Amino acid sequence: MTKLNSDVLLANALRVIAMDAVEKAKSGHPGMPMGMADIAEVLWRHNLKHNPLNPEWTNRDRFVLSNGHGSMLLYGLLHLTGYDVSMDEIRNFRQLGSKTPGHPEYGITPGVETTTGPLGQGISNAVGMAISEKLLSQRFNQEGFNVVDHMTFAFTGDGCLMEGISHEACSLAGTLGLGKLVVIYDDNGISIDGPVEGWFTEDIPARFESYGWQTIANVDGHDPEQISAAIIKAKEEDTKPTIICCKTIIGKGSPNKAGTASSHGAAFGEEEVKNIREELLWSHEPFEIPEEIYEAWNFQEKGKELESDWNKLFSEYASNFPDLAQEYSRCMSMDDPNGLEAALLEFANSMQEQKLTVATRKSSEMVINVLGPLMPELVGGSADLTGSNNTNWSGTVAITKDNFKGNYLNYGVREFAMTGIMNGMVLHGGIRPYSGTFLTFLDYARNAVRMAALMEIPTVLVYSHDSIGLGEDGPTHQPVEHLTSLRTTPNIETWRPCDTVETVFAWKAAIQNKTKPTALILSRQNLPTIDRDINQVASINKGGYVIYESSNQPKLVLISTGSELAATLEAAKVVEDSISVRVVSIPCTERFDAQGKEYIESILGKDSIRVAVEASHEDWWRKYVGLRGSVIGMDSFGESAPGNVLADHFGFTKEKIVASLRNYL
């Protein structure tokens, strides 16, 4: 065998790290890291702007491993370039409490920009990051001071491009002309079930060309010169995103398994590991990296220099544009603007006095009109339902390819990509995105919502048309199980306000919450403002509170939310002639549960009979009403009819609630 050149030798270090880590864990995916090692070496050593000593540097290039099963490629890169990922962490790959989980996880491993694993979502995150970069550059950059100026790179595989979200996200990226987005496609022709020619035969360059992307096809993914030339060409194109299609061999270096599905998702085994070491001319022990290879890979000094140069630029920028510099720092730190809370509380009190009867989707629009002037970082959007979701406001300006000084994205009918893109925007920093669709279409976006919760990021999800109350469109559009789906997801707050006042507090929670996503569940139909005193208004922030009672020692406690609360309150005033009643509004069960046992019992009553009323699936409320209690809810899909007819048919009018209560009691 001939002597290896330096690029190949350094790439081989990535290969053996991945191979050894998977072998020790007895599980993992060595094939992709070994196949993409040459590409990763060229990108990370010669083209990626980053600082291992400060993974949070705001002007770093973003790198997303969309094909997250190949996580050991990323962990190897982070270790070799000098991030806080030790060889002991590499040895503990896929073990409890390590910094090297099976798939990359945001917040666990320094240098990991987003959690990936569900294929395709990383691409949507990368699109979101590129959108944020372009929005912030348009807002903050001044002549001679490009303080926001970085690339977003994403690795992707066949699986990502088979997933529908890749089509949704990449189509929009092309329409928006995201010139600083580069996707590198690992075209190895293999997936778990074998050669993809049996199920994935589309012309990827032609597909992306139709989206409006620059396509660089037929790059040898094991030739450093071809890879380098392609990346340079991609960075030179600033009017459209680029996909670089690299022909690679999965499991490259394995004499017996390279190019086969058997290298994808399992350890090679002791004998093949020995064969691979011989094939790669790698004589070192497992987890042993020669010092000269560490020296060649280490990026700490270069990264420190890159950030230092930017810091000098930003210091001059701050001297010339102090207000802009301060605002940039505020947005990147996700600090609330001055006066935000006071403005929202003043608006809530005003709405309590005015007692408007409006749909909570309209209430939400009214709140956005309060937030918008105070939060230039607020970027709205909708999946082609702007007029129905009421996600625009008086200051809405559409973001287009030719105008990135806007504040509103028309996502088109792309619910999944919309949510993944918002996640990427939040992860980038500097932007607070929100967007809307109908609650029933949560299902299209479900996994991206879950990923936001898993990553503990404050994506704001606006879901209108929240029940059978939407009426004639029928059961295809009437959510039943969706609230339960959201509420049973860890680390998300789901608010279903009953009127404008509760909607203000829902938005307040969404904006002030920095560690979890918030879902705002809004009605299509008009709802009256409920009577409250000042203490009740303040108690909304606790997620659940007493809205009405005929006795401070009630025998019957009625629990309700959203559009059913008003009818429940009316029903309580009918039945209170025969039993002492309390009505409790719980707009956010997660916030309510967090108040603790003592508060919960003080609101729900320790020994009271409890009945919950909500036009959603019944099961969620069983934990509140207990075995003695009852739920007036939905246990079937809806029907097509006017909303008021359906409310009567399914038992959510005052009269039907009264009848149900008397029958139960």
What is the role of each PLM region?
Residues 3-4, 21-30, 58-66, 109-120, ...:
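A short glycine/serine-rich beta->alpha loop
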Residues 25, 61-62, 112-115, 143-163, ...:
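A short, small-residue-rich loop immediately preceding and capping a beta-strand
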